[in-house]
Curated annotation (Swiss-Prot):
Record organism: Schizosaccharomyces pombe (strain 972 / ATCC 24843)
Gene name linked to the record: scd1
Annotated protein name in UniProt: Rho guanine nucleotide exchange factor scd1
Domain PB1: start-end pairs: 772-859
Domain DH: 228-402
GO terms for MF: guanyl-nucleotide exchange factor activity; lipid binding
């Protein structure tokens, strides 16, 4: 009989957020006098006793089947069941309804026996009482008031003649409600009256058949299933009985807490939420299961049961979502719960019972999968069973998704409170939080633990400021609420810049490598996830996000990208950066959300809008707001162009690039992944994305350049003014306006040079006074932007020397070690070109953009952006 012993639930059936210390009840203690009532119920009975009690007390179907047989043995009541049976067939009221399937339904018939009222009056008249009740068998459920009047007289006489208390009776109003709880109480009343009848009638009492031996009542359903070799069905049935017993015990425990006022009503509701709804649903499910088991094997349709009740499984969503909160409330109120420790020990027995619904909803897919594997060939309802399997998988996924959304909402609230400096960003522009976790992140052979949050539009990496180590969560008497440490924003990458996501088994079984477009090449970092479930979740979410970014229509992208013109900043956004120090070495290069990449000129904004991602500058620089004509900075409008081949670019013109120098932090450049390494890793996994990574990105996505959108509806260029230029070492102030290159007749942009003249209107042209001897160079070193004014005929060696001197003078690099620099510019096709000679310098200067420096006298200077890579 080892099969009947309690078996531990497999950990595979539990979601990752469940505390595994509360999966199962602990074993029996040596001193049996200290056992709680629940443990006595489970441990101090033989296996055969447990199964017998489960089948004849927990099973609503078997109880009603036995009661119907005993009631029909009373001659005065037998005639009533014909009309009750007809009423059950014709009425819309049923305990469970299957389309096109008819079952013997003793539960509905006994429920009608109570609702009609007159059958109970007839049962009362069979007892040795002085006063009889009127029995009107012609009424139906349509005459509800007449039925209630009969029930009232029945209740009154039971109290007066039989001395029954309210605890032994049921509520008249509740018996007409759809809940099964009043029916369970009504069954107790009927059983009590039948017992009195059998005691008073000695002849019938001696011949009354036992519920366990009657030939017409299926005895030992579980034993029959095991004997026939249907062990999976037997496990489903046995565990369902035990599960409902646990739910009923929890429900009674909750009532005792209310009666004794151990906890407040709100706290009790917060712990148990909709436990009674789950209990009611599971009773109906068990009725449907036993209806099926009462049929021959070839006619049983378990798949139809799950299909019919798919919608009803939604009751689990609320309970499973609230479970972490319930766990914490149990911990916080353990001292009060110890007052009823004789019923349930609060530190381990109560949490172990409270987790049962979550375990059960995760167990159904496993059981049905085993049923499908053991289904004999030729079973006529096999396809229906597969559909039932699909239903229960959907239910489990929906429960998990609801729980995930709830956790994500809480995570966003917690994230907003914990981050000490948002650097001017606002959570409201990040989109929906898709997934988050605390994982180890590897880049450039450095591994650190980060809080990683993947939103629809950005990936954030945050680091805990506290040096305290996280302690494993456990349920104990002395456990206190965990203090939330502050988080520091360390890395941020636009999801539109992510190009490839692949597993990396060289770094671990559950490692994911994410490639993104950096400056000047593709870069990557590795997330070391903790288990297979997390690995599958992150891969699935990232792949869906990549597909959405690549296949989303421009209309959808623009719609998703639209953001309010005046953002509402976080409470911490006003805090300014303190500058770079040795502790600020970022594992991931931080990205400015208000500095995006080139965008196609075919998409334009008719009006100028303030960027929602303008960051607050440091205290040494004046705060300024970047004004552009972009619909949004988060969504890449030219995702195909940015990484496409030259053939794709032949039909598209590249926008002129100007820079936005707003920045709040500076970071030492990380080691850049080589393209050959990327291709090698992708080839290992047969990932067909080489066309996206074998060519370096045609624009910087790390916040070093932005696009100018021309208003094609007007030939008048919007004037753009820049802040006065100095040669000091301050980070450049954000520009407010800038002239852009000329426009072709088809609306595309022309590459601008120092000889390009700018028209102020479509009919008149005015030449600006330009400085033809000097060139202003904007040096891009990651998020730092420096300004250098040089002669137009400067040589390559002189330019390198001036750039190195500028970097040393500004003190950007704290390490006093020798270094070299490499300069690059962006050509007309958007490609990065390395400067290696004097000719390259002249070619770079040919891409200059004229910027108006003095709007009063219409004076300006040619400006070029050069990207700096530092080598140590």
């Amino acid at each position: 009989m080892a099969y009947f012993q309690d078996r531990k639930t497999s950990s595979r059936s539990l979601p990752s957020y469940i505390n595994h210390s509360t999966q199962n009840l602990v074993g029996p203690r040596k001193d049996e006098t200290n056992l709680s009532e629940y443990m006595k119920l489970r441990l101090l009975q033989s296996p055969s006793q447990v199964i017998y009690n489960l089948e004849n007390t927990v099973s609503l179907y078997r109880r009603c089947l036995n009661l119907r047989k005993r009631l029909m043995d009373i001659s005065e009541l037998a005639a009533f069941f014909d009309s009750i049976h007809r009423e059950a067939l014709n009425s819309s009221f049923k305990i469970l309804e299957f389309k096109d399937i008819e079952f013997d339904d003793p539960v509905t018939e006994i429920w009608l026996f109570c609702r009609l009222g007159y059958p109970l009056c007839a049962l009362f008249n069979c007892l040795p009482v002085k006063q009889k009740l009127e029995v009107n068998s012609s009424v139906s459920l349509e005459n509800t008031n007449v039925c209630k009047a009969s029930l009232y007289r029945f209740m009154l006489m039971c109290k007066n003649e039989l001395g029954l208390t309210d605890a032994a009776l049921f509520s008249i109003s509740e018996i007409y409600k759809p809940s099964t709880a009043p029916l369970v109480r009504a069954l107790q009343t009927i059983e009590l009256l039948l017992k009195k009848y059998e005691v008073s009638n000695t002849t019938k009492s001696s011949s009354t058949p036992s519920p366990s031996t009657d030939d017409n009542v299926p005895t030992g359903t579980l034993n029959s299933l095991i004997a026939s070799g249907r062990r999976v069905t037997a496990e489903l049935y046995e565990t369902e009985l035990k599960y409902i017993q646990d739910l009923e015990y929890l429900s009674n425990y909750m009532v005792i807490l209310q009666q004794k006022q151990i906890l407040s009503q709100d706290t009790i509701l917060s712990i148990f939420t909709n436990l009674n709804e789950i209990l009611d649903f599971q009773r109906r499910f068990l009725v449907g299961l036993e209806m099926n088991l009462s049929l021959p094997v070839e006619e049983q349709r378990l798949g139809a049961l799950f299909i019919a009740l798919e919608e009803g499984f939604s009751v689990y969503q609320v309970f499973c979502t609230n479970f972490p909160n319930a766990q914490q409330l149990i911990i916080d109120n353990q001292n009060q719960l110890l007052k009823v420790a004789n019923l349930l020990e609060p530190s381990y027995e109560l949490p172990a019972l409270l987790i049962k619904p979550i375990q059960r909803i995760c167990k159904y897919p496993l059981l049905l999968n085993q049923l499908l594997k053991g289904t004999p060939s030729g079973y006529q309802y096999e396809e229906e069973l597969k559909q039932g399997m699909a239903c229960v998988v959907r239910v489990a996924n929906q429960v998990n998704e609801t729980r995930r959304i709830h956790e994500n909402r809480n995570a966003i609230i917690e994230l907003e409170q914990r981050v000490i400096d948002w650097k001017g960003y606002s959570l409201q522009y990040f989109g929906q939080l898709l997934v988050w976790d605390v994982v180890n992140v590897c880049k450039a052979d450095i591994e650190r633990e980060y809080h990683v949050y993947l939103f629809e539009k950005i990936l954030l990496c945050c680091k805990e400021m506290s040096t305290l180590k996280r302690q494993a969560r456990s349920i104990s008497m002395n456990k206190k609420t965990k203090r939330l440490d502050s988080l520091q924003l360390k890395g941020r990458i636009l999801t539109s810049n992510i190009t490839t996501v692949v597993p990396n088994h060289h770094m671990g079984s559950y490692a994911i490598q994410i490639f993104w477009r950096g400056d000047p090449q593709h870069e990557s970092f590795i997330l070391k996830l903790r288990n297979e479930e997390s690995h599958k979740l992150w891969m699935s979410v990232l792949n869906r996000l990549l597909w959405k970014n690549e296949h989303g229509s421009p209309k959808d992208i623009r719609s998703a990208a639209s953001t309010p013109a005046n953002p509402v900043y976080n409470r911490s956004s006003s805090q300014t950066s303190k500058g770079y120090n040795s502790s600020d070495y970022d594992l991931l290069r931080t990205h400015s959300l208000d500095e995006n990449v080139n965008s196609p000129t075919s998409i334009s904004s008719p009006s100028s809008k303030s960027s929602p991602f303008t960051k607050t500058t440091s205290k040494d620089t004046k705060s300024a707001t970047t004004t552009d004509e972009r619909p949004s900075d988060f969504i890449r409008l030219n995702s195909e162009e940015s990484v496409g081949t030259s053939s794709l670019r032949t039909s598209q013109t590249t926008s002129t690039i100007v820079s936005n120098d707003s920045s709040s932090t500076a970071s030492i450049p990380s080691q850049i992944s080589r393209i050959s390494q990327v291709n090698s890793l992708l080839n290992d996994y047969n990932y067909n994305r080489q066309s996206h990574i074998t060519r370096v990105y045609s624009g910087t996505d790390d916040g070093s350049s932005v696009s100018i959108f021309e208003d094609t509806s007007s030939s008048t260029k919007q004037k753009i003014f820049d802040q006065p230029t100095t040669n000091d070492c301050d980070v450049m102030r954000p520009r407010q306006y800038s002239y852009s290159a000329g426009m072709k007749s088809d609306g595309s942009l022309l590459p601008s040079t120092k000889h390009t003249s700018l028209s102020s209107s479509s009919t008149s042209t005015s030449l600006s006074v330009r400085n033809t001897t000097n060139v202003k160079i904007r040096l891009r070193l990651h998020e730092v932007s420096l300004v250098l004014v040089v002669a137009h005929d400067i040589t390559f060696d002189e330019l390198l020397a001036k750039v190195e001197h500028k970097i040393k003078l500004c003190g950007i690099l704290k390490q006093a070690v020798p270094f070299r620099v490499r300069l690059k510019y962006v050509d007309e096709d958007g490609d990065f070109i390395t400067i290696t000679s004097d000719e390259d310098v002249l070619m770079a200067f040919e891409t200059c953009t004229f910027e108006l420096m003095d709007p009063v006298h219409n004076k300006g200077m040619d400006t070029v952006s050069l990207h700096v890579v530092v080598y140590f």
